[in-house]
Structures are given as structure tokens and as C-alpha cells.
């Protein structure tokens, strides 16, 4: 494939302005894709769609641009700029080609990328929880981070994990509160507990959940 990419780059220059230039550019993108050089492949496919928006391979180029960006996304713990770019490209593909045979695959990739973004938020919330009261009220930051993730991605596969983290953080906030805030925070924790139990009645976490009722 490396040799093919070299030859195709030369051909594109020679064939510029001819009917064969379009096909050669798409083939170049596939050559990079098959080499697993996903960043260059995506750039090449995007160049194709910009140059030949109604071209023979426009739909496939748009799809493969999104898939290449999808395959090039970083681990959840790293910066997720590439993940947002991949989502944007896949959503562009879905917008332009709503009847495509690749529609379901593209949607599945979008959902997987969104879950990666949620996982990063979950990892951040969990870190805040583990920091506890070190240099401030990290439990509150945990709650805010987890709640924002649920607001942005309400159907995420991490919904239960984020919800239990919120409940546990609220419990710790109640335990560590000053006396005048303790009763209200315990009540919030109890409300959170029942909300969790109602939404996840079969949760694996329920057997180990305990809360302390506020003193009268």
C-alpha cells in the first residue's frame, strides 16, 4: 500500500484536470486507510469531498473520512479534540446521506465516540470523588461533573455509574457538612438514593448502599 500511495500521488499530479484524477484521489485515500495512516486518509477523503462534492465516490469518501477519524481517536484519558472532529464528520455524512447503506455503522460510531467523551467525564468525576476534601470540596465538583455528563448524554451506557457516583458524593458531602447544613444534605442524599433505586431497581450497587438518616 505504501508503494501504491507513492504512485497515486504522482498520478494525481499528472492526471489533474482529467476524469481519472477523481478516481485516483479516492484510491489514494483508500491506500492511506489500508496502511492505517488514518489521519492522512481522513485528510485525503475530505479533500476529495471538497473537490468533488457530487463525485462518483463522494458518499464513500465522506463515510471513510469519518471512519478514519473514528479509528484515529485517542484514549479517553487524553485530550478529546479528535473525538469531537470525528463526531462532526460522521454527523455531516449522516446529514448528507440519510439513506446510505452505511447509516447504521456511522450512527454506531457516533454513539461509541459519545460514550468515550462520557467516559472521560466519568474518570474526571471519579478523580474528584477520590480526592475527597483534599484542598477543597471535591465531592461537589464530582457531583457537578457527573450531572453535566448525564445532562449532555442522557442515554449513555455510563448512566448508572455516573448516578451512583453522584449519590456517594452527596452522602460524603452530608457526612462532612457543618452542623447547620447536615440535615438538608442528608435529605438530599436520601432523595438521591430513592431516585437511583427507582431508576436502577436491579443495580449491582444496591446491595452495598447505605445512608444515614438525619438526626431529628
Locate the predicted segments by residue.
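Short solvent-exposed coil/turn linkers within tandem alpha-helical repeat scaffolds
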Residues: 13-21, 49-58, 77, 91-108, ...
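Conserved small/polar residues in nucleotide/adenosyl-binding loops
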Residues: 211-216
Amino acid at each position: 500500500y505504501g508503494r501504491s500511495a507513492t504512485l497515486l500521488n504522482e498520478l494525481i499530479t499528472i492526471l489533474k484536470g482529467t476524469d481519472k484524477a477523481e478516481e485516483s484521489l479516492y484510491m489514494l485515500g483508500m491506500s492511506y486507510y489500508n496502511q492505517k495512516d488514518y489521519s492522512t486518509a481522513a485528510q485525503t477523503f475530505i479533500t476529495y469531498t471538497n473537490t468533488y462534492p457530487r463525485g462518483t465516490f463522494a458518499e464513500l469518501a465522506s463515510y471513510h473520512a469519518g471512519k478514519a477519524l473514528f479509528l484515529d481517536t485517542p484514549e479517553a484519558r487524553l485530550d478529546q479534540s479528535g473525538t469531537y472532529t470525528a463526531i462532526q464528520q460522521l454527523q455531516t455524512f449522516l446529514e448528507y446521506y440519510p439513506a446510505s447503506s452505511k447509516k447504521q455503522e456511522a450512527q454506531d460510531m457516533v454513539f461509541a465516540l459519545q460514550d468515550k467523551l462520557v467516559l472521560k467525564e466519568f474518570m474526571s468525576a471519579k478523580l474528584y470523588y477520590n480526592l475527597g476534601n483534599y484542598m477543597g470540596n471535591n465531592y461537589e465538583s464530582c457531583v457537578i461533573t457527573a450531572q453535566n455528563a448525564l445532562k449532555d448524554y442522557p442515554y449513555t451506557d455510563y448512566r448508572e455509574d455516573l448516578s451512583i457516583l453522584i449519590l456517594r458524593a452527596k452522602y460524603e458531602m452530608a457526612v462532612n457538612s457543618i452542623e447547620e447544613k447536615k440535615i438538608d444534605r442528608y435529605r438530599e442524599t436520601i432523595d438521591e438514593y430513592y431516585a437511583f433505586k427507582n431508576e436502577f431497581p436491579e443495580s449491582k450497587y444496591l446491595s452495598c448502599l447505605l445512608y444515614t438518616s438525619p438526626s431529628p
